[in-house]
Amino acid sequence: MNTTFKTLASIAILSPMANAALVGLNFQGDGVINLAAGTIAGSTAGTIAPQQNWNNALNGNNNAGSIADLVSSTGSSSGITAAWLGPDSWRASGTATTGNEQMSYGFIKANGGSTQVPSGNVTVTFSGFTSGSLFDMVIYTATDNVGNLGTFTLTDLANTNASYNIGAGNVATFTDNSTRRAFTGLTAVGNSVTLTMSGTGAGLAGVQFSPIPEPSSAVLLGLGALGLLAHRTRRRA
């Protein structure tokens, strides 16, 4: 099933239970300059559900790749694989020291908005879900241009949502409904879920998800106020 998201009135994520660890995928961005700045190494990142042990996706040259077994926040195997493809990637200028700055430093882009790069959407496919299972997902976005629009679509879900503006300006902070979105109680129809991002220059910085073994035992966490040191992004000439 092809679905698009509805806007949530409140942004929250179900608390990860002991047997439902978080899984995080971070896109490092253009690897030519300062790759380390876009790598989450030993840091905690995620402004809605902070976690460690992020999986770093190197996408600096061909913007395509895969990870055979994503590591969970506990450092153990998740049994979930990831494969991604996009026409372009980019990164911020300056430095990144905290985990959240490192996550927002690099991103994979849809339709780069320049004659230098080909057009096309970003697709990320996660495989290894159990059909009918529930999970939560958080999407973190970034951009190198003011007002870029991004539309996210998830396939193989029994849920819906809508397009949204991924953020304004050269500031890599995460803002609810603008540069980060949390979706709760998603239902997998098959064993894989594909996230597609379209738009002009829209960038995907990271994805988190948390399988929920027992929905009745989940506890909602409110959003914490977590400040990020903003760093400027540089537009491609």
What are these regions (language model features)?
Residues F129-M137:
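Extended extracellular/luminal ectodomain segments enriched in beta-structured repeat modules
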Residues F126, I139-A142:
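A short glycine/threonine-centered beta-strand motif
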Residues V23, I40, T141-P211:
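Contiguous ligand/interfacial binding patches
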Residues M1-L8, A12-N19, A218-A237:
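C-terminal cell-surface anchoring/sorting signal
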Residues P215:
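Residue-level detector of conserved catalytic or cofactor/ligand-binding positions
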Residues L58-S127:
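Surface-exposed, low-complexity/disordered Ser/Thr/Gly/Pro/Asn-rich loops and linkers
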Residues S127-T130, G185:
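Short, flexible loop/turn segments at beta-strand junctions in immunoglobulin-like
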Residues M17-S43:
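Boundary/junction segments of secreted and surface-exposed precursor proteins
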